[in-house]
Amino acid sequence: MRYSETGKWSKWVGAALALFTGVALTAVGGQPTAAQGKQLTLCWAAWDPANALVELGKDFTKESGIEMKYEFVPWTSYADRFLNELNSHSKLCDLIIGDSQWIGGAAENHWYVKLNDFFAKEHISMDDFMPATVLGYSEWPKNTPNYWALPAMADAIGWTYRKDWFSRPEIQAEFKKKYGRDLAPPKTYEELKQIAEFFQGREIDGKKVYGAYIYTERGSEGITMGVTNVLYDYGFEYDNPKKPYQMQGFVNSPDAVKGLEFYKALYKCCTAPGLTNAYMQEGLDAFKSGQVAMQMNFFAFFPGLYKDPNVGGDKIGFFVNPAGPKGQFSQLGGQGISVVAVSDHRDDALRYIKWFAQPAVQQKWWQIGGYSALKAVVEAPGFPKSAPFAPQFLQTMTFVKDFWAEPSYAQLLLDMQKRVHDYVVADKGTAQQALDLLVKDWTKVFKEQGKEVMVQ
């Protein structure tokens, strides 16, 4: 999930991960019209929801006769691969499920088709989708009715925990004796740290376990997607809400410093050794192997974890990102689906968008492993009981925040990755110094973009 303005693109790519592995999948329907050769290629990341989308797409092929082809690449290569495709005006992708932070660059560089007229013609209303997903995935400029994507995959950071460990009488008794309260999913980050410390180094079923898993990955976006969950709760702001691009005193406020210090303290006290460059997959591995009591990760992975034969079912529980001293927020994940502007199959791609937006399709999308953003699905009376993590997902989507979606967001992200990782993992400098340097980095980026950066 990275994008830099065209002038800096080659420089950024050289510093980023260059290798990628493509996975092309094809789902062909049985309708005779498919033989006419109509085909769409949809590009996304290679993960469980993408497999669900392939299954869902079979219905589109049966209905339309249009064959669906899929280009899926690992998350570590997702931005490199597809932003290169878009930047070079490649016609590989007709449809793309692009990250939320791409929306500014994609709109301003005319990579995506603007969908306002199409939505009006087909009576697709953004009022029918969760507000956070419309703002995060569809709008550019933000808070304006200019739409470049349909919300496709609602997602955010949540937590899993070993419910079976938490429920053991001997563990409950020891915890209550030590802390004077019942052992339960944490409601605040202070409680989370306390629980993590309690489990750190404990032996359970003959195996040494650790308190918590949090993101530390350096190369793409991982540590930023982790630390922001704490920073938001402690009062960090990207800029002055009343004065855009005024970052001094907001990015590096005393509250933000405390949040960054807390994330480092949690990393130092309560995580497994060696996880110095870890993101989504490493978290899944740690939880599935019985290494950790609690795990930070995206809701997208929770259906698969719940089905896991070793740690799923009655053994797993879910909770929302805990609150901090200044509020309760969660880092937004997820993506919208867009039509690539240079596609030779624009009409067919728009037909897919129309089909995908239907309530019945969205309901099935949720049932088979995707995360719908459609209110008709998520606000239905039975939704909270439709999955063990559904209530937490609903709650989380009411308090999400996101990283910059500016066209220069790639450099902004690289800057934050470096400053946070240097402090948290590499033990370079103080939290105040890290955030002060980040303000300088971001000020330089925005000034190069011609933005008026206010110092006070």
Where are these regions (language model features)?
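Extracytoplasmic/periplasmic solute-binding protein
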Residues: E139-M153, I157, T188-Q248, V292
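Hinge/lid segment of periplasmic solute-binding proteins
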Residues: S100-G158, I223-G226, K315-P322, G382-A387, ...
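Long, aromatic- and glycine/proline-rich binding clefts that accommodate carbohydrate-like moieties
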Residues: P141, G313-V320, Q367-Y423, K451-Q456
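Glycine-centered hinge/linker elements that transmit conformational signals in sensory
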Residues: E191-Q200, Y234-N277, N321, V439
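Short, low-complexity disordered leader/linker segments with a strong preference
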Residues: M1-T41, K62, K444-Q456
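Extracytoplasmic/periplasmic substrate-recognition and gating elements
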Residues: N87, P141-P145, D164-W165, P169, ...
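Extracytoplasmic "Venus flytrap"/periplasmic binding protein-like
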Residues: K38, E55-A132, G136, A149, ...
